[in-house]
């Protein structure tokens, strides 16, 4: 396996267009006073970059430090251009996938299931590009797992394709994992203060993995890639999911005036069903 040493740009701060709100999710306590906040203990991230599209998956473990069962509210802010593609919540220790339904049907399902004191796992879009979901129960001194994935188009920076994920929140994690896979493209460092990673080539992808314990999220994630100037057709697999990506630039078409016809043919209905028509007006039009 050919090893390539490159960098993921983990930025402490960036200005101008890169100044974005933190997208790190959190679980807030609902309806309880004098309660300790929920703690994000573990974060496992998977970033798949294919062509001009990036899919980011975040699996989180939240801990309830209180000595009683709590109700939490999962809040997840996204930046403009990012769209949720997956949501899952653990039920009886296993992640259960959410589904997209009509708003009215989703609210009815939420109320019906909530009456049974079971968490329906309904992800709701609020103002802007923010999302939230009820998390109940949060067991006393226990944990709940939440998974969310979102897609985005790569942005442009200095003539190169750019991926940016602002997660610098200062949260200290017990365990942190980051896996990055870039399909058929070299990835390069672009900003100082970067974490050096070893990318290994596997078939048509470049893959990097990092694991850290007692890690503080004090920097953001940024990746830059050479601009794609030729057509691409790519495939990739993630578990049981397969992805197909095509990037084809269309040639600019020049406009020209359409040539006027020299003769025009007209079909005129003179059957018995046309007896009540005004033939004089039709002949005048012709």
For the regions a language model picked out, list residue spans one by one.
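Bacterial Sec-dependent N-terminal signal peptides
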Residues: 1-24
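Catalytic P-loop NTP-binding/switch module of NTPases
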Residues: 242-253
